[in-house]
């Protein structure tokens, strides 16, 4: 393909995905009707992807004046062999379906939903219509700032759900930094999503310097898979390693952190959407929220901006930090 043809394809993609999609969403919002239902059962994915699918569905329904109905997770990739009720445990733990209509109840009244692949395919916003999408990422990528309208609701539901037996790694009185590094067998064919230790070290150096400027006690924890030897570049920062640990504990610790460094992963991206802390984002396939700090592709991060945001966060956080 010639450079000119590539540029033409790029412009065509931009026009279709950005301009036309915005026009479709504007028309949908204008025509939206009471009792037009939307659900996002997700695909056959892992926890992070399925959780993020539902969060994007809640966002789309809320902003477009539709009614979100909840489809609980029934199957998750990487479910332990001895945990047949693993998806149900996560539903109870996350609590996102609390207060929402159940998809099965709406289907009982209206019949099975009409399935489409993208929210732009929903053309009839009429009363008593029922739509099912794998996710609403296409909408969320255009309007990531609108997640801020729901962040309080997400956090309240999550923290109201029972966390029985879940060990959280959080030190009261300190600045708790959680760093998620993506490793594991799921990356065999997705090596571009793996977190590099040298990038993490560069980012941690900036974080450590900023914490020194702010003053006070801090604890840095690294959550990942593998062995400590795989992360030897990070030992110089005195981090606590939490490797191959219980997934509930890991996720909860990410959500609770005062500072959360997310990986190129729906798992930590979804945790960030539930978090009340300061989020440090590295460019990936899902867009950041406007109140997140974005590092460069080379893991660079503006130290002065981080110091400023840390001080503002610490001045306003409750005594228990990001805890509810």
Model-flagged regions — what are they?
Residues 3-37, 76-216, 313-324:
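Secretory-pathway luminal glycosyltransferase catalytic domains
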Residues 51-63, 203-211:
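Histidine-anchored nucleotide/phosphate-binding helix
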Residues 293-324:
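Acidic, PIN/NYN-like endoribonuclease modules and their adjacent C-terminal/linker elements
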Residues 49, 70, 76-81, 186-189, ...:
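Short catalytic/ligand-binding loop motif for oxyanion handling, primarily in non-cytosolic enzymes
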Residues 43-52, 188, 194:
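A short, glycine/small-residue-rich beta-strand->loop->alpha-helix junction that serves as a flexible
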Residues 39, 67-73, 178-180, 221-223, ...:
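A structural signal for short, well-ordered beta-strand segments and their strand-loop junctions
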Residues 211-283, 289, 293-295:
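Donor-binding and catalytic core of enzymes assembling or modifying cell-surface/extracellular glycoconjugates
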Residues 62-74, 274-304:
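Gly/Pro- and small hydrophobic-enriched strand-loop and loop-to-helix capping segments
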């Amino acid at each position: 393909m010639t450079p000119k043809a590539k540029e033409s394809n790029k412009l065509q993609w931009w026009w279709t995905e950005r301009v036309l999609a915005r026009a479709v969403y504007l028309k949908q919002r204008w025509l939206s009707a009471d009792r037009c239902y939307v659900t996002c059962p997700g695909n056959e994915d892992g926890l992070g992807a399925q959780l993020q699918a539902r969060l994007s569905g809640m966002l789309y329904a809320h902003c477009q004046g539709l009614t979100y109905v909840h489809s609980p997770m029934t199957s998750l990739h990487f479910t332990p062999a001895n945990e047949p009720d693993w998806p149900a445990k996560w539903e109870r733990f996350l609590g996102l379906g609390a207060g929402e209509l159940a998809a099965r109840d709406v289907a009982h009244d209206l019949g099975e939903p009409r399935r489409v692949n993208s929210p732009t395919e929903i053309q009839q916003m009429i009363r008593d219509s029922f739509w099912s999408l794998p996710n609403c990422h296409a909408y969320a990528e255009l309007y990531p700032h609108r997640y801020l309208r729901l962040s309080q609701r997400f956090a309240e539901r999550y923290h109201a759900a029972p966390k029985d037996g879940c060990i959280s790694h959080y030190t009261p009185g300190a600045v708790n930094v959680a760093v998620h590094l993506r490793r594991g067998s799921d990356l065999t064919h997705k090596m571009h999503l793996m977190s590099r230790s040298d990038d993490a070290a560069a980012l941690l150096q900036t974080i450590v310097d900023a914490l020194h400027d702010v003053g006070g006690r801090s604890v840095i924890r690294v959550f990942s898979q593998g062995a400590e030897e795989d992360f030897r570049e990070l030992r110089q920062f005195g981090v606590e390693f939490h490797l191959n640990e219980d997934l509930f504990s890991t996720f909860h610790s990410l959500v609770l952190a005062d500072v959360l460094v997310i990986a190129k992963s729906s798992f930590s991206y979804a945790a960030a959407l539930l978090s009340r802390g300061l989020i440090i984002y590295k460019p990936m396939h899902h867009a950041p929220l406007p109140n997140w700090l974005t590092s460069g592709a080379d893991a660079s991060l503006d130290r002065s901006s981080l110091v400023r945001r840390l001080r503002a966060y610490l001045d306003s956080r409750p005594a228990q930090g990001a805890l509810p």
